[in-house]
């Protein structure tokens, strides 16, 4: 099974040193959108970012960039999903918007998020 990760769960799993649960359970891949690594984790996850970067370098986490999505010929679908999810969930938590949009675009069955609000993105796949 494959999974798209939201920023906060990355931070929670790594702070608890339980990130291997993600890699064991989602044996077909764990992935994030570049904005989650380059903006959200830079701003909110400084204490775990070196461990995350190690797992990215080791191929345990795959980063999807705009260019990679274009190369896969799914960038426009991703862009549409981002716009739709921004309308649904607002721009307050862009990590959440990008995580769900990436899962939808790539056909992942799992979104790992700590969101619990009624009608939140966990209900979107």
List each language-model region with its residue ranges.
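Active-site-proximal, substrate-binding regions of enzyme catalytic domains
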Residues: 1-109, 116-125
């Amino acid at each position: 099974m494959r999974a798209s990760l939201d920023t906060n769960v990355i931070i929670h799993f790594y702070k608890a040193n339980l990130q291997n649960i993600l890699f064991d359970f989602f044996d077909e891949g764990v992935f994030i959108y570049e904005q989650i690594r380059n903006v959200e984790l830079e701003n909110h996850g400084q204490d775990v970012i070196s461990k995350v970067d190690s797992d990215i370098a080791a191929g345990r986490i795959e980063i999807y960039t705009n260019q990679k999505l274009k190369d896969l010929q799914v960038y426009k679908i991703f862009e549409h999903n981002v716009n739709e999810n921004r309308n649904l969930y607002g721009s307050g938590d862009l990590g959440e918007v990008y995580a769900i949009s990436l899962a939808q675009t790539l056909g992942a069955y799992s979104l790992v998020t700590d969101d619990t609000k009624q009608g939140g993105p966990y209900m979107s796949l």
